[in-house]
Amino acid sequence: MLSKFYYCKMRKGKSPSSFFSLHKKYLLTGVTILSFIFMFQYKYHEVLTVYEDKTNVQQSSRLFWTRLLFGRTRSRITGRIFNIEIPHSSRLYVYNFFIKYLNINKEEIKYPIESYKSLGDFFSRYIREDTRPIGDLNEYSIVSPCDSEIVDFGELTSNYLDNVKGIKFNIKTFLGSDMIKKYNDDSTSFYYAIFYLSPKKYHHFHAPFNFKYKIRRHISGEVFPVFQGMFKIINNLFDINERVILSGEWKGGHVYYAAISAYNVGNIKIVNDEDLLTNNLRTQLSYMGGDINTKIYDHYKDLEIGDEVGEFKVGSSIIVIFENKKNFKWNVKPNQQISVGERIGGVDQPKQPQNKFIKIRS
C-alpha cells in the first residue's frame, strides 16, 4: 500500500524526499507561528502582572486568546470597509438586503435609504422623531436612552456588581474614578440600568432625563463583543472594553452615563465633542497602564430629556448609573425590548406629555 502511495507521488513528478521536505517546511512554519503566539501570551501575562491586573481578570490567558480573535485592529479594518462608498445604483439592493435580513422597520427611517453613502452611514441612520415619543416627564422618572434590550437593572449596594447573569464589574474601575458620595444617605440610593443595542437597532443614544454634565472620561480598552455569552468567557467585560463616561447631575442626584465600545467598528461619538477619538492605533489601553483621558468643560453641558447625546457606528451598550429616591420603582422586566423615550421607572405615576418626542441633531 505504501509503495503504491510513493509510486503515485513519483508519477506526479515528486520524489519521496521532496514530499517529506515540503511537509517538514509546513511543520516548521506552524511551530514557529505557535512559538510566537505563546511568547506573546507570556509577555501579555507579564504586562498584566506589572500593572496589578486592574480589572481582576480570572484568567489572563483567556483574555489573550479573546484579544487574538476580537482585536482592535480587526474592528478598525471593519470600520474602513463600512466607510467605503457604495455606488448610488447599488444602494437600494444592498440596504434592502440588510433591512430584510435584520428585520429593520423601513418606515421609521428618516431619510431615503439611497441617500446613505456607505454601510457605516446606513447603520448609524436617523429615525423619524415622531416615531419615538417621550413616555414620562416626571422629574424623578427615567426613560430609555436608546432602542435596545434592557439586559439588567437594579440598585447598587456595593462598589462591585456581580449578578446571576454573569455580568460583573468593579464600579471604580469602570468609571475611572471613585463614585461621588450620595446627596443624602437616608433618602437616596444609586441605581443602574444596562442596555444592549443590537446591529439592527437605531444606533444613536439620548438623554434619559434632564441632566447636565461637566466631566467626560475616555477610558481606552478592548472592543470585545458584548452579547450575553461573552460575560461567561471574560469576567469584568465592561471594565475591559473601551468606554466614554459623562459625569454630572440631575434632579435625583448624581449621574454617570456610559457608552461602551463593541466589536466590528468600536467608534463612539459624543455630540459637539470633536476632540473625542476612540479605538485609536497604538494606544496603550487603560487597564494595561495607559492613561485615562479626562476632559473638564468650563461650563456644564445641559441636556433635556430626549436630546441626542451621541452615537455608535455599530450596536453596543449603554450603562446609566444614577442616584434617585429610595421609593424609585422599575417598570420593566429583564431582557425586555424597549424603545428610546419609553418609561422604564420612576417615583410617581407617569406624566405623559402631548407631542413630546426625541430630538436629533440634523
Curated annotation (Swiss-Prot):
Residue ranges crossing the lipid bilayer per the database entry: 26-44
Membrane topology: Single-pass membrane protein
GO molecular function terms attached to this record: phosphatidylserine decarboxylase activity
InterPro entries assigned to the protein according to its UniProt record, in alphabetical order: PS_Dcarbxylase, PSD-B, PSD_type1_euk
Activity versus pH, per record: Optimum pH is 6.8.
One record GO biological process: protein autoprocessing
Residue(s) carrying Pyruvic acid (Ser): S316
Keywords: Decarboxylase, Endoplasmic reticulum, Lipid biosynthesis, Lipid metabolism, Lyase, Membrane, Phospholipid biosynthesis, Phospholipid metabolism, Pyruvate, Transmembrane, Transmembrane helix, Zymogen
Protein name: Phosphatidylserine decarboxylase proenzyme
